[in-house]
Amino acid sequence: MPPAPRLKIGLSACFQHADPARPLFTGKTLQYVEQSIAHWLMSAGAMVVMVPCPTGETARGDVTLDHYAEWLDGIVMHGGADVWPGNYGEEPLREEWVGDRVRDLYDLAVVKAFAQVGKPIFGVCRGLQLINVAFGGALYQDIE
């Protein structure tokens, strides 16, 4: 019997926005995956593909998140910074916390694209919180 085909699993991108103090890639937004999550998926036999944000100042071509959702077998949403409270209808408890609107919008669009085609969506830490928000849930902003 031939071996089962490997699953193609997307991994949402993490962002490092342009930073003039960064010694390399100054002025450029970086998109990346966290190595241990990619290795965890690979250890289960999956082919792992980062799903880059298709928008921004350097966007080229016509590839969309919908294309990735059709092609891949599922998506894992990365961890990271807290989801901005405005995304679930609340004002931030602390004014200085502005969140990462670019990443929030990207992550919400990824979840929407995969949900529309009925593909599995899994979240790690922030990713799980974001899935909750994408489907209409709310969060506690701070637990003391």
Where on the chain are the PLM-derived regions?
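N-terminal beta1-alpha1 cap of cysteine-dependent amidohydrolase-like domains
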Residues: 1-122, 133-140, 144
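Glycine-rich beta-to-alpha active-site loop
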Residues: 123, 128
